[in-house]
């Protein structure tokens, strides 16, 4: 990695995000009175709040900037979806789906943008932490809350990075050194330390759920506790290792604390968690019908979500859910489902594996034939241009459109379907907290599992580890969770679940097959390709992951 270039670039991005400009008067021995820089900025609590907004924005940029994105990568690598997209598109997503660079041998920098965005976000967090001591805080509570959120954001950014790439450069302070990768254990130590800091410092009542209209999207003590348990389960499962002071008992106590807080609950009807599953067919401007029975952003089940807006454009304003357009049906609208690029076509084997009468199936998956979409105007053109068409698409994050096909990214119909989607990415739900507590050995494991299954319309089953993990598979389908659940059960196990011997699909309207081998997944250990440009810029200090060399 070219750390010097990264530092300069990310500093500039950070200052711009905070509404500041850097000032350099090479011959005047005076400080700027009108502009802010790192020497003059970090002084007041308001400065700290603005810097924290920059940290949140740095996190959001990992989704709002063009790139693969953690969400899409997680789904394409997993067992639920294929890469899809257009029949004549480049095959870079097939490289990801099949863990096979031979699908597109020139695509050596698939994650270039993602790599940069994550380290830019980390840089912003590191800067606020660096200057924490020179800030005049108005209150101890405000100080602890702000810095707790900052540490949690850094933990989230590193948790994504280390899952995607394994050993990564570990930067907790700004540096111009050419830093090599750190062992994953060292990265996880920082992740757990940062989450522990957030748990210890963010007051439980800092962002009450009762005021979600004001607080939605903020990291709470409870979100940090849930993330701690998620990180514990993945680290101990994937690596088969432990870190001193990071224990199963502690992880369980944290998710039990989230439950006992009474801040959260399950939304009564599973489909109402997702806009497309609960939407009505509406005329342009009719928000009430469009939103239908949707429980709303920041609903009682949301523990943590990433927030977006619909103001993104092609002039550098990056604040939308940029990956949502990938989820939409290939250039096809069928109200309430809006169009997109046809990525993440759903594996029919996954569709057929649901238990009978599981309500989550219809809420999660668009069935193109049985919902009458195959008869819609424009379907034949879409079908003829679609790669790895299976007849099934992701419903949970499908874009929306009005009855006439106009994109619903803005209620007045004026928005752009490509760049202005803004559905929240729900990162932690209360259902996840319940199932993690059950998996970690809570005395109430059976009760927690039953709550989740009852909502899905299913009978009770014994709260065994196997049944809990199976439940997660369907509860969290298409939420960027299941791939990591597979990996933490062992790479060999994940490879066996993901591999396909040749599932029949249609590409360009013609017969095709998706072949994913266990060998490819095992060779890569389930990890992603480090961008070759970063390896070159580092003078080969960075080492490519096994299987991608």
Residue ranges and their predicted role:
Residues 22-24, 118-119, 190-192, 215-216, ...:
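Long, intrinsically disordered, low-complexity segments
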Residues 162-164, 169, 206, 234-243, ...:
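Short coil/turn linking the two alpha-helices of tandem helical-hairpin repeats
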């Amino acid at each position: 990695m070219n750390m010097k270039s990264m530092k300069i670039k990310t500093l500039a991005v950070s200052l711009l995000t905070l509404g500041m400009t850097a000032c350099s008067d090479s011959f005047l021995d005076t400080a700027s009175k009108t502009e802010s820089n790192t020497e003059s900025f970090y002084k007041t609590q308001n400065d700290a709040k603005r810097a924290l907004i920059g940290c949140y924005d740095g996190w959001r940029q990992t989704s709002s900037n063009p790139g693969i994105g953690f969400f899409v990568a997680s789904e394409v690598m997993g067992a639920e979806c294929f890469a899809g997209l257009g029949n004549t598109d480049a095959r870079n997503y097939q490289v990801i789906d099949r863990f096979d660079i031979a699908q597109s041998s020139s695509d050596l920098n698939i994650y270039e943008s993602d790599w940069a965005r994550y380290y830019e976000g980390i840089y912003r967090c590191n800067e606020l932490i660096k200057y924490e001591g020179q800030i005049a805080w108005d209150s101890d509570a405000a100080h602890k809350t702000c810095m707790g959120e900052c540490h949690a954001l850094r933990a989230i950014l590193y948790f994504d990075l280390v899952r995607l790439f394994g050993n990564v450069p570990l930067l907790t302070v700004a540096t111009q050194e050419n830093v090599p990768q750190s062992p994953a254990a060292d990265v996880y130590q920082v992740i757990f330390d940062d989450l522990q800091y957030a748990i210890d410092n963010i007051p439980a009542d800092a962002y009450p759920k009762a005021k979600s209209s004001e607080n939605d999207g903020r990291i709470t003590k409870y979100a940090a506790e849930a993330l701690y348990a998620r990180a514990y389960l993945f680290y101990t499962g994937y690596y088969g290792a432990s870190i001193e002071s990071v224990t199963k008992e502690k992880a369980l106590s944290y998710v039990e604390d989230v439950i006992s807080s009474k801040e959260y609950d399950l939304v009564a009807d599973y489909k109402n968690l997702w806009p497309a599953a609960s939407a009505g067919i509406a005329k342009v401007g009719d928000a009430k019908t469009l939103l239908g029975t949707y429980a709303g952003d920041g609903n009682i089940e949301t523990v943590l979500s990433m927030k977006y807006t619909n103001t993104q454009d092609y002039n550098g304003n990056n604040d939308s859910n940029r990956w949502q357009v990938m989820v939409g049906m290939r250039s096809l609208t069928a109200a309430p489902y809006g169009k997109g690029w046809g990525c993440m076509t759903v594996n029919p084997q996954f569709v057929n594996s649901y238990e009978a009468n599981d309500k989550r199936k219809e809420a999660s998956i668009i069935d193109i034939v049985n919902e009458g979409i195959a008869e819609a105007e424009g379907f034949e053109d879409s079908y003829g241009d679609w790669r790895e068409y299976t007849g099934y698409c992701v419903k949970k994050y499908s874009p929306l459109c009005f009855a006439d096909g106009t994109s619903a990214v803005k209620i007045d119909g004026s928005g752009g379907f490509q760049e202005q989607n803004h559905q929240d990415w729900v990162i932690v739900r209360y259902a996840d907290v319940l199932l993690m507590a059950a998996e970690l050995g809570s005395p109430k494991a059976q009760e927690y599992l039953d709550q989740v299954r009852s909502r899905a319309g299913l009978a009770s089953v014994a709260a065994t580890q196997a049944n809990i993990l199976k439940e997660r598979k369907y509860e969290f389908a298409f939420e960027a969770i299941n791939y990591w659940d597979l990996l933490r059960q062992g790479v060999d196990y994940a490879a066996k679940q993901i591999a396909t011997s040749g599932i029949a699909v249609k590409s360009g309207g013609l017969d095709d097959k998706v072949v994913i081998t266990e060998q490819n997944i095992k060779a890569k250990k389930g990890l992603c390709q480090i961008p070759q440009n970063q390896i070159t810029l580092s003078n080969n200090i960075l080492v490519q992951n096994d299987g991608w060399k």
